[in-house]
Amino acid sequence: MTPSKYKDEVDSLTLAGLDKIKAKDQSVVALGYNLAKFRHGKLSKAELELINHDFKLVREAGMKCLIRFGYSESIGEPDAPLSIILEQIAQLKPILRANADIIAVMQAGFIGAWGEWHSSTNGLDNAADRRKILFAELNALPKSRMIMVRTPYYVWGIFDRTTPITRTEAFNGSNYSRVGQHNDCFLANWNDYGTYVDTTVGHEYIAKDCLYAPMGGETCHVSKYCEPGNALYQLARLHWSLLNSAWNPEVYKLWEKEGCLNQVKKRLGYRFELLSGTYDDSLGVGSGFHYSIRLTNVGFAALFNPRDVQIILQRNSDSDRYAASLPIDPRFWEPGDTVDVAGEIGIPLNLPAGEYSLYLNLPDPVPQLHSRPSYSIRLANIGVWNSSTGFNSLDARLQIVRGPAAAAYKGKATFRRLTAESPSSR
């Protein structure tokens, strides 16, 4: 994750700048908006247009963004009154909703120094006001999107609950199920500069809660806790998905020197590897195609936003493509898990005969992103990714022949022809 605007690091967002970030194999850019000049009133039309334009550029670049809004860049610098914050969230709601598909996650922001929910000059650093602001933000986003809060303690105060999200309530759209964590003093000292009231309890909570909610943030400075063994352990235990690539550079230099930086980069968030697969290799139309795929997640975390899973048939003679969506939610492919995906899909009677190559596709479920390769998940295996389609090769072939099916398929899942529209290059 690369920051682009917060703390005046970059004055304006450009497509060329985003392309440079993307060339580093980073797919999420952090957009931080300092609203200091709007502490006493509505956001201007120009500010709203700027935010909307930034989202447009992120979309054009084929990336997603993490967003945060705030007023203060130091302790003692003013934030805004509650009424102003709620009014501005209401102003932002149409823009956030219209661009939710390219928002990876939102940080709660607004309150206090750096939008980190402490040192509020308007007395907003209390559970009641935090609740009003967080609930307004959750309402401003669709239920498919989540918000990161600065510490577990703040979440517990807002919801009057200290137990983590359970597997049964994960992704159910409730406010609690949509709240994750960001730690902007990761590995700084024994309690990450006050991130944890009780570090043991906080870590135990996040280790379970952030199996189903996002965890991210940044390091502060080099400390004994940044030692690679501990860093990798905590990144894995707490299920980190996003890490500010710009801060702190000294920590990254240490990790590079000690040989663990590449592992951190590879394992942030999910990282799916294909282990094996078995598939029918010759079928008549009207038959059922049987598949069995085994994958593992070697990343620190799982997916926290919705994602489709498809098997693709691509005819080798003319590249016609047919897709079938699988009845599975990959957000439950947890770190360390080995996952077996198996089932049967019908071969339509009108499917042309010929040889087909098999692919696994994990596209964004939102229609406007679904066919864009940049928004499909690339498996970690070498040589399986097709950057022009976003498909992952299963290294298997299926021969379709005309004639009666050996056994007629009676299920509902079938392959359907993909539209002729070519996927975007981004």
Region spans (language model):
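Short, acidic/polar
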Residues: 3-22, 225-233
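Catalytic cores of secreted or luminal carbohydrate-active enzymes
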Residues: 226-279
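Extracellular/luminal regions of secreted and cell-surface proteins that mediate adhesion/ECM remodeling
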Residues: 262-426
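Catalytic-core regions of glycoside hydrolase
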Residues: 105-112, 116, 120-249
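Short, well-ordered coil/turn segments that N-cap beta-strands
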Residues: 25-27, 61-65, 99-104, 142-146, ...
